[in-house]
């Protein structure tokens, strides 16, 4: 999977996600919009934890099932958290971040759209095709992965709306550079990414 040369102490145990937000689903839908400007302000780990849990965290611990629908419950989606201090792989089982690179890869995630590198956090949504049945065709794996990524992306959008964060989902990125740095082969499809940050005027 990903390169794991970073030390164990670089891993981050996230706070418990907050699920008591007073914003209703309908309000989050009403307020959802794509924004390409972000304040120069870090996202605290408690807020990040809530966004990641909403994206594809475990909401039924007894069954190990997640907040986002998943084709044949493959749970193929991986989320990489890309920040100035490095890149981390979200671990839903224990709500933690595993450091996989010490490099700031936000420019690679931004690709040709430089505004994206100004966000304090980018979430890279990847489909691990190894999770799907071997007998599935490549076309089926791609379709399932893209659909699953879409579910997760919408969860990110709604969580950011409820938490007062700006975000925008994008497909543009330097896929080759990211795969090389993260140690991902062709069984991993880098589907999309989302920038998140506080509004610039706050």
Enumerate the language-model features and the residues they cover.
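Short, acidic Gly/Pro/Ser/Thr-rich loop/turn segments
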Residues: 21, 88, 130-132, 201
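Short, flexible beta-strand-to-coil junctions
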Residues: 83-85, 128-129, 196
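Small-aliphatic-rich amphipathic alpha-helix that forms the alpha element of a beta-alpha
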Residues: 32, 51, 79, 121-132, ...
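Short, surface-exposed helix-loop/turn micro-motifs enriched in polar/charged residues
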Residues: 71, 167-170, 186
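N-terminal amphipathic, basic helical "cap/leader" segment at the start of enzyme domains
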Residues: 6-119
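A glycine-rich helix N-cap at a beta->alpha junction
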Residues: 183-202
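Generic beta-structure capping elements
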Residues: 17, 126-128, 199
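Bacterial N-terminal signal peptides
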Residues: 1-3
């Amino acid at each position: 999977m990903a390169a794991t040369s970073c030390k164990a102490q670089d891993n981050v145990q996230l706070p418990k996600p907050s699920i008591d937000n007073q914003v209703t689903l309908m309000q989050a839908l009403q307020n959802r919009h794509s924004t390409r400007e972000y304040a120069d302000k870090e996202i605290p780990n408690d807020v990040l934890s809530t966004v990641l849990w909403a994206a594809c965290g475990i909401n039924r611990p007894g069954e190990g099932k997640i907040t986002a629908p998943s084709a044949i419950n493959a749970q193929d989606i991986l989320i990489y958290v890309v920040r100035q201090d490095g890149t981390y792989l979200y671990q839903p089982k224990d709500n933690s971040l595993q450091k996989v690179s010490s490099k700031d890869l936000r420019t690679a995630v931004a690709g040709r759209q430089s505004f994206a590198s100004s966000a304090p956090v980018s979430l890279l949504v990847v489909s691990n095709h190894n999770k799907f049945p071997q007998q599935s065709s490549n076309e089926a794996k791609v379709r399932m992965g893209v659909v699953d990524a879409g579910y997760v992306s919408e969860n990110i959008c709604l969580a950011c709306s409820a938490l007062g964060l700006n975000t925008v989902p994008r497909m543009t990125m330097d896929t080759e550079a990211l795969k090389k740095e993260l140690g991902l082969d062709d069984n991993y499809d880098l589907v999309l990414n989302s920038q998140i940050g506080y509004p610039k005027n706050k």
